[in-house]
Amino acid sequence: MSVENLKEALPEYAKDLKLNLGSITRTTELNEEQLWGTLLASAAATRNTQVLTEIGAEAADTLSAEAYHAALGAASVMAMNNVFYRGRGFLDGKYDDLRAGLRMNIIGNPGVEKANFELWCFAVSAINGCPDCVASHEHTLREAGVSRETIQEALKAAAIISGVAQAIVTSQTLATAG
């Protein structure tokens, strides 16, 4: 199970995604933990079984157990937070004075370098489409001294994984419908 299997699963019309997936795994802008944590958290955020299985297997070979669990934790807590904060954002500030009341302890104590965890939360928030969370995590990353190039590379990784997941679902759906 691997990125190579995902590339092979992509249909011809998704050739750009295949090339981008190959390129992102060779990035020099992200260190290994940043890259594979971003890929794993993004794969979890897509809710695509095949993408998560393939990325998860390769990430398990690369990441420490702590980083592996933290990346999945980022995807989980952001699934909750992205819905909450995106939903509250639709309400024109009428609920901004109320306490969220949601447990999110992993954000304060992720078990890995805080900036890496924030990077994974940023990537997942982009996939889940929460502008407030994307902006908040980007601000935290910049305050921590993370470069714009590193942040953009994580965004690219999230975009590629999201596109791969969609292309695979589209291909599988059309194959079973025809």
Swiss-Prot record:
One of its GO terms (biological process) is cell redox homeostasis. It is an enzyme of class 1 (oxidoreductase). Disulfide bonds join C130-C133. One of its GO terms (molecular function) is alkyl hydroperoxide reductase activity. Pfam families: CMD. Keywords: Antioxidant, Disulfide bond, Oxidoreductase, Peroxidase, Redox-active center. The active site is at C130, C133. It catalyses: N(6)-[(R)-dihydrolipoyl]-L-lysyl-[lipoyl-carrier protein] + a hydroperoxide = N(6)-[(R)-lipoyl]-L-lysyl-[lipoyl-carrier protein] + an alcohol + H2O. The keyword Mitochondrion does not apply. Its EC number is 1.11.1.28. Antioxidant protein with alkyl hydroperoxidase activity. Required for the reduction of the AhpC active site cysteine residues and for the regeneration of the AhpC enzyme activity. PANTHER family: ALKYL HYDROPEROXIDE REDUCTASE AHPD. Homotrimer. Belongs to the AhpD family. This is Alkyl hydroperoxide reductase AhpD.
